[in-house]
UniProtKB/Swiss-Prot annotation:
GO MF annotations in UniProt: ATP binding; ligase activity, forming carbon-nitrogen bonds; zinc ion binding
Pfam families: QueC
Catalytic activity: 7-carboxy-7-deazaguanine + NH4(+) + ATP = 7-cyano-7-deazaguanine + ADP + phosphate + H2O + H(+)
GO BP term, pick one: queuosine biosynthetic process
EC number: 6.3.4.20
Co-factor remark: Binds 1 zinc ion per subunit.
Gene3D superfamilies: HUPs
SUPFAM superfamilies: Adenine nucleotide alpha hydrolases-like
Domain of life: Bacteria
Family, similarity comment: Belongs to the QueC family.
PANTHER family per record: 7-CYANO-7-DEAZAGUANINE SYNTHASE
Protein name: 7-cyano-7-deazaguanine synthase
Length: 239
């Protein structure tokens, strides 16, 4: 399915840097942009109110908040249990302790059902394989498998668009700046695992990744913007 044939999309929208940047871009490309946010009892559930506020501010077509608290019951993680501190070290299985098993499987499934009801042709999600947190459900192969499952399971043409898949964090900041929304993304989104808007706590892994990317972009704007244009043009991982 070509982008030209898509007019109505559903954005998986957490209120964080990545999904907000995807939402901003979608508003320039599609006629109808619908957001869906998931409340799974997450540690940083302040992001839900941030998502609501941003949805109104950016004037998207509609915004749905879904209660998926069953995920909290099933998936034990530092993001679903306040008693488990966020760690900078990997667990024995090689994954961060902030990994929530099945989260993106559930989110994309529900977003697919929502898209079906709306008659939307695509789902947009801000997952990224190039500069990511080590989550297996952020990988390109996973997304393509989910897309195939949704198409076959609902007998409907449906594309999962991943604008950030092959971008690093600096390039994601550049993308927000390209749409003149760098300040909004920097100061009004919530990426921090401890629920602090903007630059966050500065200590959790999410804040470290976000800060490092921002510093890289601000120090090398022209170079990063050029690399963004190249990555966007090819749609492939950069050497």
């Amino acid at each position: 399915m070509s982008a030209a044939s898509v007019s109505k999309v559903v954005v998986v929208f957490s209120g964080g840097q990545d999904s907000t940047t995807c939402l901003i871009q979608a508003l320039t490309q599609f006629d109808e942009v619908h957001g869906i946010t998931f409340d799974y009892g997450q540690r940083h559930r302040e992001e839900i109110e941030v998502a609501k506020s941003l949805a109104k501010r950016l004037k998207i077509t509609s915004h749905k908040v879904m209660d998926v608290s069953l995920l909290n019951e099933l998936a034990i993680s530092a993001l679903t249990r306040d008693a488990i501190p966020v760690s900078h070290e990997l667990m024995e299985n090689g994954l961060p302790n902030t990994f929530v098993p099945g989260r993106n499987i559930l989110f994309l499934t529900l977003a697919g059902i929502f898209a079906y009801q709306l008659g939307a042709e695509a789902i947009i999600t801000g997952v990224c394989e190039t500069d990511f947190s080590g989550y297996p459900d952020c990988r390109h192969d996973f997304v393509r498998a989910m897309e195939s499952a949704l198409v076959q399971g609902m007998d409907k043409k449906l594309e999962i668009i991943t604008p950030l898949m092959w971008l690093n964090k600096a390039q994601t900041w550049a993308l927000a700046d390209k749409y003149q929304q760098l300040d909004l993304v920097r100061h009004h989104t919530l990426t921090c695992y401890n629920g602090i808007v903007g630059d966050g706590c500065g200590d959790c892994p999410a804040c470290h990744l976000r800060k490092r990317g921002l510093e890289d972009y601000l120090q090398n704007k022209a170079e990063v913007m050029a690399s963004l244009d190249k990555a966007t043009a090819t749609g492939k991982p950069q050497a």
